[in-house]
A protein has these predicted regions:
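General beta-strand structural signal in soluble alpha/beta enzymes
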Residues: 102, 127-131
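Rossmann-like NAD(P)-binding element
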Residues: 55, 60-92, 99
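NAD(P)+-binding Rossmann beta1-loop-alpha1 motif at the extreme N-terminus of oxidoreductases
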Residues: 1-52, 89
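Rossmann-fold NAD(P)-binding glycine/threonine-rich loop
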Residues: 106-127
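Single conserved hydrophobic/aromatic residue that forms the stacking wall/gate
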Residues: 131-139
Length: 139
């Protein structure tokens, strides 16, 4: 069992969180939008994925420190415009040896960096990228 912190509770982040949880991993999801965390915790449903049931084992937090601390894998699932700011907030809590995964697509307009280059710039470590179609409902 891996301990996985997912930063971002949109459709892609939640679809991956569900899949990783039902695969037997310990998953914790964070969102910068506190009302989103409250709703997901209470209803166990995502408004954009109405057919998906959120497993009881899937946990949520409003603390970026908690989602990063003591995790084997950190998965960044925030929109590309928020990758840099989210990585900067997470930086104090990212530990050596953690695997960093990004699922956001895009290029930062000012620097022309890819999302993994932004994570390397902000976190001081290399990450990997998981690309696919935007078919979160197919997971």
């Amino acid at each position: 069992m891996k301990r996985i912190g997912i930063l971002g509770a949109g459709t892609w982040g939640m679809a991956l969180a569900r899949m990783l949880t039902v695969s037997g991993n310990d998953v914790l999801v964070w969102s910068a939008i506190e009302k989103e965390i409250d709703s997901l915790s209470t209803t166990r449903k995502h408004p954009n994925l109405p057919q998906m049931k959120i497993p009881d084992e899937l946990r949520f937090t409003k603390s970026i420190e908690e989602v990063c601390k003591d995790k084997d894998i950190l998965l960044f699932a925030v929109p590309s415009v928020f990758v840099r700011s989210t990585a900067a907030k997470a930086r104090p809590y990212v530990a050596d040896g953690q695997i960093i995964v990004d699922v956001a697509k895009g290029i930062e307009p000012d620097t022309l960096y890819t999302m993994t280059e932004i994570l390397a710039d902000e976190l001081g470590k290399e990450g990997c990228l998981l690309y696919t179609s935007d078919a979160a409902d197919e997971l």
